[in-house]
Amino acid sequence: LEGVADLAISGYSIPGHLGTEMSSVEFVAVAHPDHALHQANRELTFQDLESQLQVVIRDSGRQQPRDVGWLGAEQRWTVGSLGTATTFVSNGLGFAWLPRHMIERELREGLLKPLPLDKGGNRNPTFYLYSSKDRPLGPATQILIDLIRTFDTAPLTTALTAPQHA
């Protein structure tokens, strides 16, 4: 957090900070149905993925940034958002691990298809909510924390309404 952010949500444990555990998110390895990986018509291995273009999401961390989910594939494109990755992969450019809840429409419409991996086709990282330990949180930030906690486990179809404060 480095004194820059009041709140952070991360899939990583941040050394020196105590995070509040939130939900896990299912990430699915996917590619367009016409992608070469789907043409093998068999269970895929890590070696099959190494020679293919992998689309990875740039980590926004300032120290030790990581390309999230990168396998070390020979070719990779690093993009700035999950939406961009979804657009690239659903148009036939590479493969990626993407959050299932964000790609349900593409899966349903046949723009994306889960890769038949022998292992690791689904990942379920747990996310953590961190708040600044360097300064007290203001009322607006506390309301945001309450909203995040309230809707963290709510179905995506839940209407968003602010929590009631006494």
Whereabouts are the PLM-identified features?
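A bilobed periplasmic-binding-protein/Venus flytrap-type ligand-binding module shared by bacterial periplasmic
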Residues: 30-34, 126-137
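Short, charged alpha-helical segments
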Residues: 124, 136-139, 143-146
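C-terminal regulatory
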Residues: 14-93, 98-123, 146-166
